Structures are given as structure tokens and as C-alpha cells.
């Protein structure tokens, strides 16, 4: 992907700045997948509750997606004068092209579809804020992303069509809004819970990997994860939330010895075929936002 040396034709953003944020997005995806052990998720130890994907698929996928993150930022900047509700339609073709490269990189395996949506939104929000000379903070980025998604849940989940998507079915049956609802609300699970929790643990001197694992537990305990519900129904989701909450109440992940609890949790998730992929996507955003 070729870009001008200093700025794009239609924006005033320096290529170096665009690439800096794109690199953070790539690092966020790698940080999440390499984090181990993660209950039910692909990591350096095993493939979790997945039989169709491995660690290397995620590495290839993240690299393919990194090449598209500057496009999201650029579009966010180019569309800065548009009404925010109009931005999402312009982002969709970029997201679909990015998704195509992901599938080509992984031979058809869906590794990061959720992250394309969420990181794409945040990158576009960053581009818009930079173009408008507004502060780029976790709060402003998430509120800007939310403005792009206004009405999204109504449009895409509240439908009476005979052929429901998995997301529409989970919304009708359990009231779960998934990635769309979290985005439209401005990522409250990240902004109000995961990010301050993670930053507090780092400020206390906790090892960054342990802090991130503990933050993953917090997300698993609070997130209405549609990935989990689609595999295990409401019962599977409630079980996973209870188990994560129990570990947090016992003190969470504070020492390497606590990793044994996560390994046992991982084994139980694999037995139940549960994978908290939605929480993993939110963890990617948490790490990403912690860097800006």
C-alpha cells in the first residue's frame, strides 16, 4: 500500500502519524493472541475451544489487517466534515476489503472479523479527531466511534425477517447486542471497566501480562459475549461469567501461581466448547487505548 511521504492528498495528517496508530493496532492484536493462558481462546499454549485455527493464523491475519488500518484512519480524516452517522457506510467497503485479505491470509479462517469492525471504528475515529485538531484520548476516540454507529442496533438487530442472522437471533432470544451494541454505546465495558482496571494494575507494579489476564477475566465476567452464547446458549454464558467472577473474587491473577486457575478454567472451557471471542476483541481495544 503506497502512501505519500508526508501527508495524504485530502488530509493534513502525516504518514508517520497514521502508521504509528496502525502499528499500535497490529501490536494490540498480537499482544492479545500471544497472551497465555487464556480460557477457551487461541494462545501460545493451545488452540482453546477452536479446532479450525491456530496461533500462526492469528499472526498472519494481524499482519494482513495492519495494512488496512491506515485506510480507516485516512477515511476518518477525509470524512471529518461529514455527519458522523454517514461515516459508517463509507467504512464498510474498507472493512470488507480488509476482511477479504484476512480470509486470504488464513485460508478462509475467521480470526479477526470482530477486530476489523472495532479497530476500524477506532482508527476512523482517530483520523477524524486528528483532522479536526481535537484531543485523541480513549474517551474521545470511543465517543466518536459511537457517533458513527448511532442507530446501528435498531437497524441491524431489531428485525422481523424470517431468516435471522446469528446476531439477530441472540438479540431476540437473550437481548444481547454484541459488538454493535458495545460500539454504539461508546465501548462502556472498556472505558468504564477494563481500561481503568488495567491501568490501575500497571500503576501498582503488576506484571503487564498478569494485569492483562486479570483484565480479561473482568471482561469475561461482565460482557454479554455473543461468541459464548452462540456456542453454549444462555447457560454457557452465565456459567462462564460466574467462573470468571469467582476467580476475581478469590483475588484474580496477581502472581504466576495464579495461572494454574486459568489453566483449569481453560480446560473447562474447552470441554464445554466455549470461547469468549467477544471479550478477546474488547481486550485488544483495552490494550490499544492504553497506549494513546
UniProtKB/Swiss-Prot annotation:
Recorded catalytic activity of this chain's protein: 3'-dephospho-CoA + ATP = 2'-(5''-triphospho-alpha-D-ribosyl)-3'-dephospho-CoA + adenine
BP term (GO), one: prosthetic group biosynthetic process
Entries under InterPro entries matching the protein: CitG, TriPribosyl-deP-CoA_syn_CitG
Coiled-coil spans in chain: none
EC number: 2.4.2.52
Keywords associated with the record: ATP-binding, Nucleotide-binding, Transferase
A Pfam match: CitG
Protein name: 2-(5''-triphosphoribosyl)-3'-dephosphocoenzyme-A synthase
UniProt source species: Escherichia coli O6:K15:H31 (strain 536 / UPEC)
Gene behind this protein: citG
